[in-house]
């Protein structure tokens, strides 16, 4: 049974926006249908009836791109949507990040957010519509949520900021930023940029926040009209008496958290916890739940002391000051057969990035609900369990790995040379070998070194750094180059990557409601200083890209042919191009504009393939001289091959200055002769002459004598109308147009 639909409308980035509630998915705790232009997104929120016995908040966000939204039927045998693509995974993370901090502390009900893209208009962002729909569904539901939030995309076209740029505007923008937050603060940023200065990045974030405030006011109208009362929930609290008793352990905790080395520090903390758990085992044997609280209380002390030491005493767990970067080390060229390798180490975080160069045909084909595209630059990030000293099952890359890989890709894309300048597909793989925080940023540094080691002519080196934040009341401390414990116990993970001239990528996640302009400004400046320090170190390892590619990398040459000739090169069913590949051992890719890429590690194979393709697409030019081969002899003349696939007729009268009665008196099959093309008729048939070349070789006196002889011969002939009819029919029968 259909419910009563209520519609709320406004505009967003110059396009119509409407929200429908009350009609669809009524059994969910909350649902909203968002129409933005021709984009239609359904967002639903469901909560479990009872809390889960977990030590974390069980929130799941699934963003699903339905292929019917763009009128496509899925491929594959089943013709169903399969596992989510990379864009869907990244969008799920994008929506999760701004809503997660706004659920109550200690809230443990299972929350599932599902977003269906049901119609997709490329000019009206389904991702941002999905974020808006999620916030509305949560805000009008009975689920406790300290929203609403909103998110927008900000671009910069011709120096002007634009809200939710269209696909055409995105082609021109030097900045693409997604920012989300509440009416009072920003709590999520994701950006890719073309070396944008820090002040421009900050202004773009604040520009987006103004639009966020307007969208939140719009949502509040919806909540006032249809919002449900929030359900009651319980949050377990530690026993106050037990907490007071365990205060005796605090001095030992303070000492343990200041052990500088990661594993030694973890061991020291665990020893303190184990000691006090053992002390209380006998006493609390009849109260197992309270015994479980002992480790929880002590872990809370660990968090409290780490944060206090940083904010009050300005001392970090490893002894650094807030703005100090861990020791750096880097190397290149470690793997002899790989095309490029960069090993980057920062403290106890180490990443080996490997660059592989491939042909254009190796590019990844992206075919989702967006426009189909070929992706010639890829960055993949792997995080094996041994990197943190653990033994656990190895599975396919998860959301975190995909997200970190995409962040590195976004950071490096602005420095990758254009296809016309460097016609290679580039794949980077970052293997995390050790991790104690900031591994995604180490992968960016390692990847830059790998690109330079591979000889890729990058625009400029890129480095990345992760900033942190500890906030206690009105006091806060911004941390440079956070390690794992600071990331885990801190309030912000703020990743900034860029060149010496500006930012290429930025990502911010926070665990508090939001941060202010002042904190953003300080974090960006501190990150800039740190980034420049890291870049200086990297350039000491390898100052410029290598001038030569690895001998194991394919050589790629390009040639341009007439697009009308592409079908001739490919041949029926690919017969011709496959024949060239089989004979030469090369890889061949042909673009629609007639650009041909020929790749191989063997230069001779490349040269032969170029010659074969050149013969296929070569055009006959009137007036040019060719070294031809006699292929067929007829009474009226001989057919000669000018080059492979192109023949011409040399008429019997065009062989010599003298009259030729029999063609075979002057040429034989297989003879090589020089001829000059004299005509291409309207049917494409080519006429050539040997006599024309002989005439060109005569001296003026010889030519004059020849012309006089011809004139005399013509005058001695009887008139044409007095001649009898020819007995052999036409002078020249039809011939092949080859």
UniProtKB/Swiss-Prot annotation:
Coiled coil: none annotated. InterPro entries: ExoRNase_PH_dom1, ExoRNase_PH_dom2, ExoRNase_PH_dom2_sf, KH_dom, KH_dom_type_1, KH_dom_type_1_sf, NA-bd_OB-fold, PNPase. Residues 704-738 are annotated as: Disordered. It is an enzyme of class 2 (transferase). Its EC number is 2.7.7.8. Its main location: cytoplasm. The keyword Manganese does not apply. SUPFAM superfamilies: Eukaryotic type KH-domain (KH-domain type I) (SSF54791), Nucleic acid-binding proteins (SSF50249), Ribonuclease PH domain 2-like (SSF55666), Ribosomal protein S5 domain 2-like (SSF54211). This is Polyribonucleotide nucleotidyltransferase. It comes from Exiguobacterium sp. (strain ATCC BAA-1283 / AT1b). The gene is pnp.
């Amino acid at each position: 049974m259909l419910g009563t639909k209520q519609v709320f409308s406004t505009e967003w980035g110059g396009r119509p926006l409407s929200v429908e509630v009350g009609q669809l998915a009524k059994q969910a705790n909350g649902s909203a249908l968002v129409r933005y232009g021709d984009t239609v997104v359904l967002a639903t929120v469901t909560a479990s009836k009872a809390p889960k016995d977990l030590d974390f908040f069980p929130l799941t966000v699934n963003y699903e791109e339905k292929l019917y939204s763009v009128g496509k039927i899925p491929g594959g045998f089943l013709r169903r949507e399969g596992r989510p693509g990379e864009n869907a995974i990244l969008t799920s993370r994008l929506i999760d990040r701004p809503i997660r901090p706004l659920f109550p502390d200690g809230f443990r009900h299972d929350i599932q957010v599902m977003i269906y893209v049901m119609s997709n208009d490329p000019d009206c962002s389904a991702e941002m519509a999905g974020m808006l729909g999620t916030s509305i569904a949560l805000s009008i539901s009975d689920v406790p949520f300290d929203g609403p939030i909103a998110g927008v995309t900000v671009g910069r076209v011709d120096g002007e900021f634009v809200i939710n740029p269209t696909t055409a505007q995105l082609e021109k923008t030097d900045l693409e930023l997604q920012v989300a937050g509440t009416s009072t603060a920003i709590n999520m940023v994701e950006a890719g940029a073309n070396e944008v200065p820090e002040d421009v990045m900050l202004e773009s974030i604040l520009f987006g926040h103004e639009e966020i405030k307007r969208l939140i006011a719009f949502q509040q109208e919806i909540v006032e009209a249809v919002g449900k009362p929030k359900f009651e929930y319980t949050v377990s609290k530690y026993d106050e008496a037990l907490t007071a008793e365990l205060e005796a352990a605090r001095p030992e905790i303070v000492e343990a958290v200041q052990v500088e080395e990661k594993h030694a520090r973890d061991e020291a903390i665990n020893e303190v916890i184990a000691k006090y758990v053992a002390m209380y085992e006998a006493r609390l044997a009849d109260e197992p739940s309270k015994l479980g609280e002992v480790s929880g209380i002590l872990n809370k002390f660990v968090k409290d002391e780490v944060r206090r030491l940083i904010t009050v005493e300005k001392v970090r767990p490893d002894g650094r000051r807030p703005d100090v970067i861990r020791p750096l080390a880097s190397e290149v060229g470690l793997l002899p057969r790989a095309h490029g390798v960069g090993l980057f180490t920062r403290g106890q975080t180490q990443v080996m990035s490997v660059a592989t160069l491939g042909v254009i045909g190796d590019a990844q084909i992206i075919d989702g609900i967006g426009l189909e595209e070929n992706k010639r630059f890829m960055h993949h990030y792997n995080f094996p369990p041994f990197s943190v000293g653990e033994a656990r099952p190895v599975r396919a890359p998860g959301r975190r790995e995909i997200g970190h890989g995409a962040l590195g890709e976004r950071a490096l894309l602005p420095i990758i040379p254009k296809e016309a300048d460097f016609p290679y597909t580039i794949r980077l793989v970052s293997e995390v070998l050790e991790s104690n925080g900031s591994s995604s940023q180490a992968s960016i540094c390692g990847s830059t070194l790998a690109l330079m080691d591979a000889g890729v002519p990058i625009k400029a080196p890129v480095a990345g750094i992760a900033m942190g934040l500890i906030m206690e009341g009105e006091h806060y401390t911004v941390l440079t180059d956070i390690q794992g414990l600071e990331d885990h116990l801190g309030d912000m993970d703020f990743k900034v990557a860029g060149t010496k001239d500006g930012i290429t990528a930025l990502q911010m996640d926070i665990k508090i409601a939001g941060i202010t302009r002042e904190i953003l400004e300080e974090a960006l400046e501190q990150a800039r200083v740190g980034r420049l320090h890291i870049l200086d170190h990297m350039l000491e390892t390898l100052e410029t890209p290598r001038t030569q590619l690895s001998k194991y990398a394919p050589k790629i040459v390009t040639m341009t042919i007439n697009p009308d000739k592409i079908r001739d090169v490919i041949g029926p069913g690919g017969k011709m191009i496959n024949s060239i590949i089989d004979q030469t051992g090369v890889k061949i890719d042909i673009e629609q504009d007639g650009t041909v890429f020929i790749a191989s590690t063997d230069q001779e194979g490349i040269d032969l393939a170029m010659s074969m393709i050149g013969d296929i697409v070569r055009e006959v030019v009137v007036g040019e001289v060719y070294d031809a081969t006699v292929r067929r002899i007829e009474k009226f003349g001989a057919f000669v091959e000018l080059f492979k696939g192109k023949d011409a007729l040399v008429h019997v009268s065009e062989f010599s200055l003298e009259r030729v009665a029999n063609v075979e008196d002057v040429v034989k099959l297989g003879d090589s002769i020089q001829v000059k093309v004299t005509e291409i008729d309207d049917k494409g048939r080519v006429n050539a002459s040997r006599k024309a070349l002989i005439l060109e070789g005569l001296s003026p006196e010889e030519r004059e004598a020849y012309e006089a002889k011809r004139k005399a011969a013509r005058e001695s002939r009887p008139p044409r109308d007095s001649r009898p009819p020819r007995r052999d029919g036409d002078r020249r029968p039809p011939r092949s147009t080859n």
